[in-house]
Amino acid sequence: MKNYLTLDVGGSAIKYALIQEDLSIIEKSSVPTPMDNLENFIETICQIYDQFQNQIEGIAISMPGIIDPERGYQYTGGALRYITNLDTVQILQERCPTNITIGNDAKCAANAEIGFGNLQDIQDGAVVILGTGIGGCLIKDHKVHTGKHFSAGEFSFIKTNNQDALSWNHAWSTRCGIQGLLERVQEQLESDQKYSGIEIFEMANQGDEKVIAGINAFAKEVATQIFNVHIIFDCEKIAIGGGISAQPLLIDLIKENLNEIYAHLGFDVYHPEIVPCRFRNDANLIGALYQHLQTFKSQD
């Protein structure tokens, strides 16, 4: 069984794992993400490679930013501001002589679902990741749809209010990231007390009606934009990911609000199935591996 080093580069940590082709995770750990400069970032990746170089067939990397996965080229690096117009794979291969692939993090999460998860049986669909912002990906003909400029599915930028279209206040990422959820609950509780996502769902699952109302207000806005994505793209399924997607209450409320939209539409349209992502915290690692395997399978 072949082993692969997979990395999920985030704004605070680089998670890495030694994974076999059958998705067995042999070892997993993390290191802080260098935020100061490119040199330290490259050196950190290479130090991880040094630990496993004699055990692996290649490196698969998930990263933020706008990425051309075929060239291994990054136009932007998301929170990693020192990455701009960078031949990332070429630079890494100078120090790590092995097969290397990189992909956008949300698109890697989608690849995990296409290859091994809850979107294996579709041709067209979407993935919505509810996190700090909104991660997104469109799936066309059973493949991630990158778009001409590799930025298709950047749902974070969707505007939700034309009265304030020039600021981020009503971007989908602001309204429906985790902070947006916390604010809806605080509004219902009429409290300035800060709660975590875990605490909110514990309170909701114990029957706190005000908390449930806050979650429902959040779910209604998520459902509205999911409806818009579907009407534009005609999805068979839409998978919802991110840590809070593990909460059945949230998925149920999103479905209920979507059904209400359909009921008042006045036209018959296909209702895509709404499913949680199978892979949660490991989605980017698994999806990066799927992209890597597909890349070198096509080159054989």
Per-segment meaning from a language model:
Residues 20, 63, 140-141:
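A cytosolic small-molecule/anion-sensing beta-strand core signal
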Residues 120-173:
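Glycine-rich phosphate-binding loop of actin/hexokinase-like ATP-binding domains
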Residues 100-106:
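General beta-strand structural signal in soluble alpha/beta enzymes
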Residues 1-58, 67-71, 92-98, 115-122, ...:
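ATP-binding/phosphotransfer module of carbohydrate and carboxylate kinases, centering on a glycine-rich
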Residues 29-31, 78, 148:
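Short hydrophobic alpha-helix segments
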Residues 24-25, 74, 144-145:
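Hydrophobic "anchor" residues
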Residues 73-85:
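A charged helix-plus-loop insertion that forms the helical arch/lid used to bind
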Residues 32-34, 82, 151-154:
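A short acidic/small-residue loop/turn micro-motif
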